[in-house]
Regions:
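Short, acidic, small-residue-rich periplasmic hinge/interaction motif at the N-terminus
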Residues: 21-67, 75
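Extracytoplasmic beta-strand/coil segments of soluble accessory domains associated
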Residues: 76-124
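Short acidic/polar hinge/loop motifs at secondary-structure boundaries
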Residues: 124-151
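Repeated loop/turn-to-beta-strand initiation elements of outer-membrane beta-barrel proteins
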Residues: 205-209, 242-247, 287-292, 301, ...
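Flexible loop and strand-edge segments within Gram-negative outer membrane beta-barrel domains
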Residues: 217-224, 228, 242-325
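Outer-membrane beta-barrel signature, preferentially recognizing the C-terminal barrel domain
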Residues: 262-285, 321, 376-378, 426-428, ...
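Gram-negative outer-membrane beta-barrel transporters
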Residues: 390-393, 481-484, 498-568, 591-598, ...
Length: 628
């Protein structure tokens, strides 16, 4: 099936729903609304909004699904649920950082390791201040009430790095008076242990959430151990009927060992990583207006031993880095007249990074040649406005513009425009055009011999057409996109230059259908064509899941297929195809105790996601959940 065929199918479906009939009366629309599922999201709109009125494609993963996965990391659940989204892996547990690491998030041929995917926590950006990539080991399941994933550029609202999409982690907080406590303990293959404890409390105006987690594993290859500690705390206070405040902090520390690839082993390589996040916000909610002012920071301290290739030798220095992303964000969303919504906001970010080396023997800072060390301060300030207007009962238009000024690259204009048409039978037809961009990183500007202080931002335009129908019985969606961009940063003659181009197009499909009261089928598929392929982007990804629920039992069988996943590009292009079969089951013994078990790669498939890093064959985990 080619793109023209799918466009024809979408157009025919839309027409058959009678969306063009202006005679639709209020009673018909009310009936449609009662049959559809009204989903409220915050990603892509700043303030909360009904996804049926937004021209964006947002997937929401709720707390119940996060808990049912029994994963300590959020990312495996996100990969299963979002069409086309990929996260690289090299072992059973632990992504790591630096050379040989995994955790690279990709979507539509745009990748997080290049700063083209943005992760948010409560709407605040999270990335390394030197390399601008997400730190995938930081995103633990115990912090999340839900996760919202926006496919396609979101730079109009969130600025740099939101080229390929956004993953927004909304942190947990109790909404009703009372208290909840949970404890999870699990163990499995290769000495893997995962534990976490969470306590939540709310009394009148006050609410608190606190959690702590620990995990470790030997993994399936020698010298590939991983150990992690983490936790989060959140305090909320309702100042009045219209005003509330919250303070949120989380931290993680992990140690990761690195054996190198199977063809080029490395000895003695190890990483010690500490990451932290803190934010404070003041929120207002009135009948026709909502808004928020927040301050935030994310920071990290990295110490890395790169190891040596000779097993009889040892390295004599550590690579160290410090980075911080600190900012202020404010927005107000208001209804100016009937069926309208105007959102205006300002963002300020201060981005800091320092990279240097120290002696193992003395601890002193070493002088390095070839720009191996450096320090950078960059500032970014932006203002944006987004207007959403219902022209008719069944049609909404949306247009926005961001003006962003970066202290190095200057001023960038980022427009976005879209339209939604709603059918009488709970259908939504969406058209969207949006610009995405990212500013060059500290590494690209100042570190290592290829660095170039005259770099400009990367820029893309994304065009997409989608059809979705959400009812209480059957939900499905089809999305077509086309991406074209230039100014992509590449190394030419040993220097970073804005010369690369990108031209990608593809189709994304997802569907969920309850076969009866006990059995639900879910599936998603994506096809991607890239003029210039990139690592970690599969040409096809498909997920098929059966979820069975009966009494105290829950069983889920999931098959995930990857076709032509690029592990190397260029002259030595390499790609692989494989299918993974996973099975999980849980038994709720009583109101307090749940027992569960999970098996992954049950077919013992031999495959690689990172070139030279074979993944483990079949693995298993089992555990208990105690809820009070």
């Amino acid at each position: 099936m080619n793109i023209k065929s799918v466009i024809a199918i979408l157009a025919t479906s839309w027409a058959s729903q009678g969306v063009h009939a202006k005679t639709t009366n209020a009673q018909t629309m009310e009936s449609a609304d009662s049959a559809s599922i009204s989903e409220i999201v915050v990603t892509g709109t700043r303030g909360s909004g009904d996804i049926r009125h937004l021209p964006l494609n947002v997937t929401t993963i709720r707390r119940a699904e996060i808990e049912a996965s029994h994963e300590q990391s959020l990312l495996p659940t996100v990969v299963r649920r979002v069409p086309g989204l990929m996260v690289t892996s090299r072992a059973m547990k632990g992504y790591g950082v630096s050379t040989g690491s995994s955790g690279n998030i990709s979507l539509r041929g745009l990748v997080g390791s290049m700063g083209q995917m943005l992760v948010l926590i409560d709407g605040h950006p999270q990335y390394n201040g030197i390399y601008s990539h997400p730190i995938s080991d930081s995103y633990n399941a115990d912090m999340a009430e839900r996760v919202e994933i926006l496919r396609g550029p979101a730079s109009m609202l969130y600025g740099s790095n939101a080229m390929g999409g956004v993953i927004n982690i909304v942190t947990r907080q109790m909404d009703t008076d009372g208290c909840k406590t949970s404890l999870n303990i699990s163990g499995g293959s290769y000495g893997t242990i995962e534990t976490n404890a969470t306590a939540m409390w709310k009394q009148r105006k006050w609410s608190t959430t606190a959690s702590a987690n620990y995990g470790r594993t030997d993994n399936h290859r020698p010298h590939m151990g991983f150990e992690q500690w983490g936790g989060m705390a959140k305090v909320g206070y309702d100042i009045s009927k219209h005003w509330s405040a919250s303070i949120n902090a989380n931290a993680t520390a992990f140690t990761s060992r690195y054996p190198g690839s199977t063809d080029a082993p490395v000895y003695g390589a190890e990483q010690w990583i500490k990451r932290g996040v803190a934010s404070a916000s003041l929120t207002n909610r009135y009948g026709n207006s909502t808004g928020e002012v927040s301050v935030f920071t994310s920071f990290g301290f990295h110490k890395i031993d790169d190891g040596v290739k000779d097993p009889t030798a040892s390295s004599n220095r550590y690579f160290r880095s410090k980075d911080a992303l600190t900012g202020v964000s404010a927005y107000q969303s208001m209804r100016l007249w009937t069926d309208s919504r105007l959102t205006i906001g300002v963002d300020y970010q201060h981005i800091y990074g320092r990279a240097y080396y120290t002696s193992k023997e003395t601890g002193e800072v070493l002088n390095t040649a070839n720009k191996q060390s450096g320090r950078s301060y960059r500032n970014e300030i932006a203002g944006y406005a987004d207007l959403r207007q219902d022209l008719m009962e069944w049609m909404t238009i949306d247009a926005g513009l961001r003006i962003d000024h970066h202290s190095v690259t200057g001023t960038e204009l980022i427009p976005q425009v879209g339209m939604v048409a709603r059918t009488p039978k709970a259908g939504e037809f969406k058209v969207m055009a949006s610009k995405g961009y990212r500013n060059p990183t500290m590494r690209e500007l100042y570190l290592y011999p290829p660095s170039n202080e005259e770099l400009e931002p990367e820029r893309i335009w994304n065009y997409e057409l989608s059809w979705r129908r959400n009812t209480k019985g059957f939900n499905y969606g089809v999305n077509i996109f086309y991406i074209k961009g230039d100014n992509m940063i590449q190394v030419v003659n040993r220097k970073n230059v804005n010369t690369g181009k990108i031209e990608n197009h593809g189709i994304e499909i997802d569907m969920e259908y309850p076969l009866d009261n006990h059995l639900t089928v879910y599936t998603n598929h994506s096809w991607l064509k890239m003029k210039n392929p990139v690592v970690a982007a599969p040409e096809y990804k498909g997920v098929f899941a059966l979820n069975y629920h009966c009494g105290k039992w829950n069983v889920a069988l999931t098959a995930t297929e990857f076709t032509n996943l690029y592990t190397a590009v260029g002259e030595n292009e390499t790609k692989g195809s494989f299918m993974l079969l996973d099975l999980s089951a849980s038994y709720r013994a009583n109101s307090m105790l749940t027992l569960w078990a999970r098996g992954e790669n049950l077919l013992a498939e031999r495959y690689e996601i990172n070139l030279g890093y074979p993944m483990p064959k079949a693995t298993a985990m089992a555990g208990i959940c105690i809820s009070l």
